[in-house]
Amino acid sequence: MNCSELLPPASVRGMRELQRAEFQKRVQVPQLRVPEQQVQRVIPLVKKFLLKMEHMHPVRAVDKSREILLHPMPIKAWESLPTEDLQKQQVTQENFSFVELELNYENWSANEILKSVLPEEEEGMTSYSRIGHIVHLNLRDHLLPYKQLIGEVLRDKLPNCRTVVNKASSIDNTYRNFQLELICGEAEYQVETKENGIPFEFDFSKVYWNPRLSTEHERIVKLLQPGDVLYDVFAGVGPFSVPAAKKRCHVLANDLNPVSFHWLQHNAKRNKCLSNIKMSNKDGREFILKELRADLLQRLRLTDTSSYATHITMNLPAMAVEFLDAFRGLYTDNELADISDAVVFPTVHVYSFAKGENTKALVRAQVEQNLASTLDEKQLQGISFVRNVAPNKDMYRVSFKLTRHLLTTSKEAEANNVRKRCAEDEKVDPEVAATKVKCV
């Protein structure tokens, strides 16, 4: 008997409308029939051969005996079993036989059902995300004709799944949240979920939340100690800010999306950390130029920055690097004149996508271009791979230290300095040098 006989019927291939009754089939499987009192001694001997399928117990009561169902792939005959050990328990070939089973839709997992239905020559459904009671898909074009069936199978098979949605388009709106298509279940998008042990609540249809970033959120939060400072420029519903505030860090969190801002406040209150967090609802650049600027200046002037760490998170990978120039010339020389040279400036963690061959080099170039500055070894704290987003498209975190020079020199002033240096090197008039490409 071939193991393929335990798979769903071949006739369901290509099914687009879920017909559960079509999955019925009858198969022959090996079994041992033993007296009830012997079961506890026999099971350990055949445990690795037990037939394990959804909603099917491998040991069935029949009168005063027990039928132990075995997997037909390794067990072709009595001789396939550990016969000597079984005979010591008074189990012989007479206890061995084949029995007919009726399998149906309930006996296969979601993965087994979908593999049997979806086109064999195309890539199947590789993954999905769980957010509370919602299952979030990102189906490729060739699977769209099967989306209704896929949704029904997942709702049937996944515990506590009530809503299945598909990503309807790329994230291109102002607030960077997913555009969703309901393909099965309830149009109920308010969810409760936990990330790294912390509860969050939000409307998934109106905010951005990606459970695949939970490990990255945890990495950053682990860097923080009580008393540290976190400026979260694109805070969303709080996956960085709320855990940091719970650790008794001083947090300034911001998000442009008013719905995200609402749930950020809700999650801070729910997690009882409101006393450690200040929240704002504005553009990230405005937040940097106002709230972050004022709070950081006060800390640089009035506190011992060597006694705590300051971090700035910028998790908006599609465009966060475009906000880095806001740090250039954030302060005047006079504002930082009385600050000790021993001051410890913040570490920025900026996230970005890069597409191409050497994505790590590309993402560094993006950061340096937007900063209008090369990051030396002392400044650059690391470039960390976060996840693969698509073929040849990766997400990275670039961590670097801000410096007095960056914070007091605007991009324009930096460009002028570069042009002057070029002019001096080439011993030509600065205005002439400024027209040359290599001096820009």
Swiss-Prot record:
UniProt-listed Enzyme Commission number(s): 2.1.1.228
Protein name: tRNA (guanine(37)-N(1))-methyltransferase
Reaction(s) the record says it catalyses: guanosine(37) in tRNA + S-adenosyl-L-methionine = N(1)-methylguanosine(37) in tRNA + S-adenosyl-L-homocysteine + H(+)
Subunit structure: Monomer.
GO annotation, biological process: mitochondrial tRNA methylation; tRNA N1-guanine methylation
CC terms in the record's Gene Ontology section: mitochondrial matrix; nucleus
GO MF annotation, one: tRNA (guanine(37)-N1)-methyltransferase activity
Keywords tagged on the record: Cytoplasm, Methyltransferase, Mitochondrion, Nucleus, S-adenosyl-L-methionine, Transferase, tRNA processing
Chain sites annotated for binding S-adenosyl-L-methionine: H217, D255, L256, D283, G284, N315
Transmembrane domains' residue ranges: none
